[in-house]
């Protein structure tokens, strides 16, 4: 853009200089190029070449850019983990407490990656809701693991909102946790309340089924009701007919029994 403007201004200067140089060489006053006409010619040339692209000096200031929004800080679930804590695989090792300070520092969370910190957070959530020390497969433990993963997905998507693949995985994990919470609420309500309280989960009921009413649906519904009523009427008539036949059969059988006893 800058090179184009420079090129056009150079061409314009050369064209104007050529007009005046021809006038000097002829040493005659050109009636067609008076001072006013030359200025008008110059203005016309400027307006012709710079109508679409104004010069850099006279270009108007446009306030089209939107102000940059500051992202709100998303609280991380790993903030409460101290850097002096040992990793999960070394926390239960007695020898890790008596090693050299340099070696012990290498085993802490200060030199741990994100997955190791997330594993320790999962173990902390599991310890809050598990039924006993050896419980690793109950519904409460599964809900705790899924909760840690969901919060990790939320933190990641807050930094990278265009990551559609992880968003899909997060929604699938949320649906799986809803299914487990629904089962736990139906079978063990006391454990369900404990899990929601300890993990900070707000359980919301699924929305009621809603279908938009259309003319086609109304016509189909009216036809189905008409068919249902007709079928019920035919079944009622058939039942009445069967009752009448049964009563006639009983009446005929009762009338023949006294004759047999008299004989």
Swiss-Prot record:
The keyword Flavoprotein does not apply. GO terms for molecular function: structural constituent of ribosome. GO terms for biological process: translation. Residues 238-251 have a biased composition (Basic and acidic residues). Residues 1-70 form a transit peptide. Residues 238-263 are annotated as: Disordered. Gene3D superfamilies: S15/NS1, RNA-binding (1.10.287.10). Keywords: Mitochondrion, Ribonucleoprotein, Ribosomal protein, Transit peptide. One of its GO terms (cellular component) is mitochondrial small ribosomal subunit. The keyword Ribonucleoprotein applies. Its main location: mitochondrion. Coiled coil: none annotated. It holds the Pfam family Ribosomal_S15. It is found in: Mitochondrion. Component of the mitochondrial ribosome small subunit (28S) which comprises a 12S rRNA and about 30 distinct proteins. HAMAP family: Ribosomal_uS15_B. NCBIfam families: S15_bact. Belongs to the universal ribosomal protein uS15 family. This is Small ribosomal subunit protein uS15m. It comes from Danio rerio (Zebrafish).
């Amino acid at each position: 853009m800058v090179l184009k403007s420079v090129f056009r201004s150079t061409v314009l200067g050369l064209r104007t200089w050529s007009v005046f140089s021809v006038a000097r060489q002829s040493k005659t006053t050109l009636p067609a190029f008076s001072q006013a006409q030359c200025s008008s010619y110059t203005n016309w040339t400027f307006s012709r070449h710079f109508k679409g692209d104004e010069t850099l000096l006279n270009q108007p200031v446009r306030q089209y850019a939107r102000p940059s929004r500051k992202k709100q800080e998303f609280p991380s679930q790993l903030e409460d983990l101290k850097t002096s804590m040992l990793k999960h695989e070394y926390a239960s090792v007695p020898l890790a407490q008596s090693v050299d300070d340099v070696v012990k520092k290498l085993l802490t969370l200060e030199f741990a990656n994100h997955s190791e910190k997330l594993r320790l957070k999962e173990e902390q959530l599991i310890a809050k809701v598990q039924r006993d020390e050896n419980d690793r497969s109950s519904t409460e433990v599964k809900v705790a693991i899924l909760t840690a993963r969901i919060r990790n997905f939320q933190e990641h998507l807050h930094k990278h909102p265009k990551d559609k693949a992880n968003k899909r995985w997060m929604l699938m994990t949320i649906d799986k946790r809803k299914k487990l919470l629904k089962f736990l609420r139906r079978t063990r309500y006391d454990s369900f309340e404990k899990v929601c309280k300890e993990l900070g989960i707000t359980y919301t009921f699924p929305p009621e089924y809603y279908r938009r009413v259309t003319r086609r649906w109304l016509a189909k519904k009216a036809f189905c009701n008409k068919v249902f009523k007709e079928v019920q009427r035919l079944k009622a008539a058939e039942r009445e007919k069967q009752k009448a036949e049964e009563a006639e059969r009983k009446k005929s059988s009762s009338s023949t029994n006294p004759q047999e006893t008299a004989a």
